[in-house]
Amino acid sequence: HNWFWLIPLDERRTSVGVVMDIADFRAAKVTPEAALDEAFAAAPIMRTRMAAAKRITEVYAIGDYSYRNTRMHGPRWLLAGDAAGFIDPIFSTGVFLALHSAEQAAATLDFALRHPLLGRIRMASYARNLNRQMNRYLRFATAWYTDEFVDVFTAAKPLFRIPQAVNSVLGGNIHPNFSVWWRLQLFYLVLWVQKRHALVPRLEELKAEAAPAPSGVT
């Protein structure tokens, strides 16, 4: 499940790249430039958009850029935003987590300054909450790269309003009510089952059915 980014840098330059499974990249045994060109060729929209583009820098590859600090706080310091961790940007949660954690960090530091004896406890609570939030978004991002996630999330007839629950959390609902929470748990259960037994049509099967028959075959 490759995905592309196109980020305008100015009126004439745009950062363009593709995120792909590292196993696929290694198996292809090609240069980063060749891998990027092959990804463009396999995606009609990107192939069209990049047809007249001029490459002005070298193409390079970088491995897993998600990270998490093992320690979020200490005497007279607290981590927030990208200093605390960074999650795969597929769902664009980075800015949200950075701003939200900054707000929570400010509140935590304010409390610690006003209540020095309880500051360490409040900082530990902050770290637990931030880790919990990053875990939730990392779980979504990891699931995205599986066939079953795409099957379930894009099903023509969504099961139990699961996509709405997922979108609610991806949209910033970090304290979901029970109605959303149980659908999220069901979502992961459905993914587990979908991997083994098709509850909804598999995308690869739908693609095969929609593909035109070879010439001369009826």
Identify the residue ranges that each predicted region occupies:
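FAD/FMN-dependent oxidoreductases across multiple families
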Residues: 4, 24-108, 113, 117-124
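A short, hydrophobic, proline-anchored segment that marks a local hinge/packing element in signaling
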Residues: 7-11
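Short, well-ordered beta-strand elements
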Residues: 14-21
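C-terminal helical "tail/cap" subdomain of flavin- and related membrane-associated enzymes
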Residues: 107-218
